[in-house]
Design a protein with these regions (language model features):
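Short, well-formed alpha-helical segments that are part of the catalytic scaffolds
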Residues: 15-31
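A conserved acidic beta->alpha catalytic loop
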Residues: 25, 44-53, 96
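Glycine-rich, basic loop-to-helix element that forms the pyrophosphate-binding segment
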Residues: 68-84, 105
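Short aromatic/hydrophobic "clamp" motif used to bind/position activated sugar donors
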Residues: 89
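Short, flexible, basic/aromatic active-site loop/helix in glycosyltransferases
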Residues: 120, 138-163
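Active-site-adjacent helix/loop segment of glycosyltransferases
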Residues: 219-311, 317-321, 337
Length: 337
């Protein structure tokens, strides 16, 4: 008999339409797993709309809505975690829809220590959303060790940087995550800019292996317009610095290389306009050919090449902003703590 019990924590900010759909998919997954009474905690992270009210009006779940000022996802999860009564916690986000049989698959594993920690196989919803194809292409490139051969497997610190992972749809023992959060030291001055995924998962991977399977899946609904995409790209650039600009990570040297060489490339472009115009055309074409050779779908590769320059500019600006937050404003203010 499975002795594992589940609490679900969902940070929510200005997402009244998404939260209802997220909860609906969660209810289906809980029902199919035979645990419909599991504790669900929605943390309204200072929404300026009716997100919290929409969550409270949802029926069919053992649901509590916790309201806080806008402190970001990390603090929302921490405050939600404090209310958890289950042996394990599932972190969800409002744009993430859990697969209907995902919990049914993973639940029997949770009672065994070596299979008690799971990260989801996240599928991007590309229907009518070319921007989602961009992110899927990026994931297929960086996590191709798994993406080219999805299977039930696990990884540890030795191959941590080669597998897709995140705290979205993460299932973990409550006490492990509480310990990870208590040991977490932010490297930026704004909790809303904190990249909790990498630090928390590295902490967990030091103690147990992280499991992943195409049977434990969820769907991510990416932003659908260019403005939101560029804003998100800028944010991802800043949290990349927080999560991976440290010795021992796979991306540490490549990140420093980009940060150092980018100003030089800009100088060359301004010094030789013809060369800059050639680069504007040739580099995206080269990217298209390269990612095709890495197994990326043709349509995804086309979107990646088309958005290469706007993404690169906003992402790079985010990286420099993250560098400033990491080294120029290291102290987190008392108001944010």
């Amino acid at each position: 008999m499975n002795t594992a019990t589940l609490s679900i924590v969902i940070p929510a900010y200005n997402s009244p339409n998404w939260i209802t759909q997220c909860l609906s998919h969660l209810a289906s997954a809980l029902s199919n797993a035979g645990i419909p009474e599991s504790q669900v905690i929605v943390v309204d992270d200072g929404s300026t709309d009716n997100t919290g009210d929409e969550a409270e009006s949802f029926t069919g779940l053992n649901l509590t809505v916790l309201r806080q000022s806008n402190l970001g996802r990390f603090k929302a999860r921490e405050n939600g975690l404090a209310l958890c009564t289950g042996t394990h916690v599932l972190f969800l986000d409002t744009r993430v829809f859990l697969g209907k049989d995902s919990l049914k698959f993973v639940l029997p594993f949770l009672q065994h220590p070596e299979t008690s920690l799971w990260t989801a196989d996240v599928q991007a919803n590309t229907t009518g959303n070319p921007i989602a194809r961009f992110w899927r292409a990026i994931e297929n490139i960086f996590w191709r060790r798994y993406m080219n051969n999805p299977r039930t497997t696990s990884f540890g610190l030795e191959d941590f940087d080669y597998y897709p992972k995140g705290t979205t749809a993460l299932i973990a023992p409550v006490e492990l995550i509480r310990e990870a959060i208590s040991q977490f030291v932010p490297t930026v001055g704004d909790w809303r800019k904190v990249n909790d995924d990498t630090a928390l998962l590295r902490f967990a991977a030091e103690r147990t292996r992280i499991n992943i399977s195409p049977e434990y899946t969820c769907t991510y609904n990416a932003r659908t317009n260019l403005r939101a995409f560029l804003k998100h790209a800028n944010h991802r650039g800043s949290v990349l610095i927080d999560g991976y600009l440290r010795s021992g990570t796979r991306l540490n040297i490549p990140i420093w290389s980009v940060l150092i060489l980018a100003p030089f490339g800009l100088y060359v472009a301004f010094s030789n306009l013809l060369l800059a115009l050639i680069a504007l055309a040739v580099i995206p074409l080269s990217v298209f050919v390269l990612v095709l050779s890495l197994g990326v779908r043709v349509k995804d590769a086309l979107v990646l090449a088309s958005l290469f320059w706007p993404f690169s500019i906003y992402y790079l600006l985010g990286m420099y902003w993250g560098l400033w937050l990491k080294f120029g404003r290291r102290n987190t203010s008392s108001e944010q703590l």
